[in-house]
């Protein structure tokens, strides 16, 4: 018997014996295809099954299903001979209440909210110019690479970045995230970002863990929650000090670019000049009013005294302005020095060679004789064999 023959027999057996079945479960993944067909996974506590509902059938459904929906389906089981993969073909669909994941999320959210963990009174302010920034995420994630790339593009070299590796998906992820959070919170950081890129509701569910939420609330370090995409909400978003819709948005919120800093200093100088001119104008008007009021020859001494007071005030204002300008110049010099130091580092990094084996970054001490590796820099790459 060939695989095709076996699959055809299995298909006939399934379609004969599994007709008009009522199937209940929770959607864990779904794709609303451009063709109009719906493809999704339905799960219970222990298992899941691939399902499909074709356009002709789903036009009769009065809602768009989503991850977390608990559904009751009617249909039959079928099998594709080409792949040997079987799935449930739904002919009707109706909602049967909230799914387990959604129910757990809403129950925990309501309980923590009543306890006050989401209260704005407990939110810590984010630093304006952070110098020590921690990022908790998977060290191999695309989200981390996107964040580091954006920091480099902004030319913000004042901050030192600390990476805390943690699982961001699966049953062991909450414990891993908590351990990383405790370690980071003991390092006297200015701010901490908990980040993960997009994924299904199940993929992100580790950030709905109650113990993780309580550790975030207890942390002394200001925390930004940057999980998934803008439409994704998890418990850590509500308990953190600030919620960023994406990991990249967290970087945009936290870091100024070099141009932003220069514009801020220019604006500060402009405001100081406006304040100085305003004060001078006020005192000039005061002197003018006094000179009009005191018209008698017996009062020239008083007028002279007021003029001297005005001159003294003008000197004080000039002195204050000069001090502020010197302070701004020193601050700008520090920013420029920091930029030049880090710019030199990044220029040197262009000469670094990266070793990859089987598509992954490899440590030199892990390589063996006859291993085939790829040596790459920012400008080229070569294949090499370890002797």
Swiss-Prot record:
Q: Which Pfam families match?
A: Exonuc_VII_L, tRNA_anti_2
Instruction: Just give the chief location class.
Output: cytoplasm
Q: Which CDD domains match?
A: ExoVII_LU_OBF
**TM spans, by residue?**
none
Reactions the enzyme catalyzes = Exonucleolytic cleavage in either 5'- to 3'- or 3'- to 5'-direction to yield nucleoside 5'-phosphates
- Cellular component GO terms held in the UniProt record: cytoplasm; exodeoxyribonuclease VII complex
Q: What class of enzyme is it?
A: hydrolase
The entry's keywords: Cytoplasm, Exonuclease, Hydrolase, Nuclease
Q: Which residues form a coiled coil?
A: none
Which EC number(s) does UniProt give?
A: 3.1.11.6
Question: Which GO biological-process labels does this protein carry?
Answer: DNA catabolic process
NCBIfam families named in the record? xseA
The family note in this entry says:
Belongs to the XseA family.
| Assembly information from the UniProt record | Heterooligomer composed of large and small subunits.
> Which function does this protein serve?
Bidirectionally degrades single-stranded DNA into large acid-insoluble oligonucleotides, which are then degraded further into small acid-soluble oligonucleotides.
This protein's name:
Exodeoxyribonuclease 7 large subunit
Q: Source species, please?
A: Campylobacter jejuni subsp. jejuni serotype O:6 (strain 81116 / NCTC 11828)
């Amino acid at each position: 018997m060939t695989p095709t023959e076996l699959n055809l027999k299995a298909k006939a057996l399934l379609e004969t014996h599994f007709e008009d079945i009522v199937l209940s479960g929770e959607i864990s993944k779904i794709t609303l295809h451009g063709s109009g067909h719906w493809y999704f996974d339905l799960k219970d506590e222990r298992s899941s099954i691939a399902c499909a509902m074709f356009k002709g059938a789903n036009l009769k459904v009065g809602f768009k299903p989503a991850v977390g929906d608990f559904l009751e389906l009617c249909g039959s089981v079928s099998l594709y001979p080409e792949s040997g993969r079987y799935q449930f073909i739904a002919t009707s669909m109706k909602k049967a209440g909230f799914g387990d994941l959604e129910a757990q999320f809403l129950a925990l959210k309501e309980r923590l909210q009543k306890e006050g963990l989401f209260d704005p009174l407990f939110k810590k302010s984010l630093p304006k110019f952070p110098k020590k920034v921690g990022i908790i995420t998977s060290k191999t994630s695309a989200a981390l690479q996107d964040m580091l790339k954006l920091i480099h593009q902004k030319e913000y070299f004042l901050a030192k970045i600390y990476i805390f590796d943690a699982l961001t998906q699966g049953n062991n992820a909450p414990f891993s995230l908590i351990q990383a959070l405790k370690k980071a919170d003991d390092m006297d950081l200015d701010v901490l970002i908990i980040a993960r890129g997009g994924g299904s509701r199940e993929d992100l569910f580790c950030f709905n863990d109650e113990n993780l939420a309580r550790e975030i609330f207890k942390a002394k370090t200001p925390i930004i929650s940057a999980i998934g995409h803008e439409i994704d909400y998890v418990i850590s978003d509500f308990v953190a000090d600030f919620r960023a819709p994406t990991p990249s948005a967290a970087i945009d919120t936290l870091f100024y670019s070099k141009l932003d800093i220069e514009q801020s200093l220019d604006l500060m100088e402009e405001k100081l000049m406006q304040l100085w001119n305003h004060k001078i104008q006020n005192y000039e008007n005061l002197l003018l009013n006094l000179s009009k009021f005191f018209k008698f020859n017996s009062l020239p001494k008083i007028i002279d005294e007021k003029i001297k007071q005005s001159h003294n005030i003008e000197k004080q204002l000039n002195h204050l302005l000069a001090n502020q300008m010197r302070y701004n110049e020193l601050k700008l010099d520090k920013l420029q020095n920091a930029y030049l130091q880090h710019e030199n580092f990044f220029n040197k990094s262009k000469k670094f060679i990266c070793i990859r084996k089987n598509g992954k970054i490899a440590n030199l001490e892990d390589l063996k004789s006859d291993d085939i590796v790829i040596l790459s820099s920012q400008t080229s790459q070569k294949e090499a064999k370890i002797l």
